[in-house]
């Protein structure tokens, strides 16, 4: 993996207007940064240490220095050792995201990033998309699809149960880099409101971004103090999306579509509005475990079979179909992928 110099990290922070002050000697600017860390216990020689978190304590920086840190990045209030080389920033979370992208050599630029946000259905839709893409990739003898979800994470090197929906920016960039190293072409991920609010996905550009729905949820002193904060966090997503797939059946659709204009292209889907780009009709419950419907697009008008019942899963499937169309996946792979798709035993 390419290694960047300390001066490169300073440059990218300056480019994003995050730097307030640089307090270090020119002699260390050409130091190769071998590690990026926000956990002081993991610091080694030539580490760029990030002072972040509500629970940050000065002793963490002291430990990082003892363990061999080259310099640290901090907001003004956490500059607890002014004599040690440091970079002062105005937003530590955006700074962490920016330097994480650089440390892993901007992996999101080398893979199709597919992000999903919404109150409900993210996990199911993520697995629908993965199943469709995996069917296509298998047919062409290509690596399968990486996924970062609230259920589990698979990046070609690691396969593990997920602890949170969207990981911290440095961990996310590692997963993306692993997928790139494994020659994967696509990565599907859930993008939570917290990830957007706390800038964990800052500087990640999505080839496809799906906005499933919005309703009052996650309102608490821990996550979002009110619905407006929650909704505004979700809407930040569109600024990072090239092709936006939007559910016309969602509440607050006018505001969603207004913000979706930030994307280069909007693809709509619906079970109610025939004018949608991807429209489901003739929905039939076949058994207690299966449902069928016809889907009409500009390219095809065909029947789809799902082995996960419920109208909400028809909406999730439409989102997956819209995504597949953006990526030019043929209908046969869409059909095959949805027919066998399961969300790791969980039905949303």
Regions found by a protein language model. Give the residues of each.
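Adenine nucleotide phosphate-binding catalytic loops in nucleotide-utilizing enzymes
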Residues: 169, 223-231, 258, 262-348
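Phosphate-binding loop of NTP-binding sites
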Residues: 96-244, 248, 252-265, 318, ...
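Short, polar loop motifs at secondary-structure junctions
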Residues: 70-80, 149-152, 248-252, 271-272
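N-terminal leader/targeting and accessory segments in enzymes
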Residues: 1-98, 281-282, 305, 309, ...
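Short, acidic/turn-prone active-site loops that include or flank metal/cofactor-
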Residues: 77-78, 91-94, 213-217, 270-274
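Active-site regions of enzymes building and remodeling cell-envelope glycoconjugates
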Residues: 81-91, 160-163, 207, 262-268, ...
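A short, basic/flexible loop-to-alpha-helix module at the beginning of a structural domain
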Residues: 37-40, 101-107, 346-348
């Amino acid at each position: 993996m390419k290694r960047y110099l300390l001066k490169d990290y300073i440059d990218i922070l300056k480019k994003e207007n995050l730097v307030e002050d640089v307090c270090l000697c020119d002699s260390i600017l050409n130091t190769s940064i071998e590690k990026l860390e926000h956990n002081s216990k993991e610091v080694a020689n030539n580490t760029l240490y990030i002072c972040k978190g509500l629970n940050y304590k000065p002793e963490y920086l002291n430990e990082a220095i003892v363990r061999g840190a080259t310099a640290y990045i901090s907001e003004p209030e956490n500059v607890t050792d002014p004599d040690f080389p440091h970079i002062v920033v105005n937003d530590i979370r955006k700074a962490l995201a920016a330097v994480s992208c650089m440390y892993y050599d901007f992996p999101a630029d080398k893979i199709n990033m597919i992000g999903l946000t919404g109150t409900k259905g993210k996990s199911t839709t993520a697995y629908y998309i993965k199943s469709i893409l995996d069917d296509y990739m298998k047919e062409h003898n290509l690596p399968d699809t990486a996924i970062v979800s609230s259920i589990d994470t698979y990046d070609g090197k690691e396969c593990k149960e997920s602890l949170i929906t969207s990981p911290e920016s440095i961990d996310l960039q590692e997963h993306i880099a692993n997928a790139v190293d494994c020659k994967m072409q696509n990565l599907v991920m859930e993008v939570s409101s917290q990830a957007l609010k706390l800038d964990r996905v800052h500087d990640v550009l999505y080839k496809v971004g799906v906005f499933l729905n919005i309703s009052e949820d996650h309102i608490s002193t821990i996550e979002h103090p009110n619905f407006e904060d929650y909704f505004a966090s979700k809407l930040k997503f569109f600024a990072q999306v090239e092709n936006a797939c939007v559910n016309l059946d969602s509440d607050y659709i006018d505001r969603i579509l207004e913000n979706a204009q930030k994307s280069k292209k909007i693809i709509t889907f619906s079970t109610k509005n025939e004018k949608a780009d991807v429209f489901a009709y003739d929905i039939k419950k076949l058994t207690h475990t299966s449902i069928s419907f016809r889907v009409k697009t500009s390219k095809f008008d065909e029947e789809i079979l799902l082995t996960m019942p419920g109208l909400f899963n028809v909406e999730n499937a439409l989102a997956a179909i819209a995504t597949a169309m953006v990526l030019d996946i043929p209908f046969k792979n869409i059909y095959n992928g949805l027919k066998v798709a399961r969300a790791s035993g969980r039905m949303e």
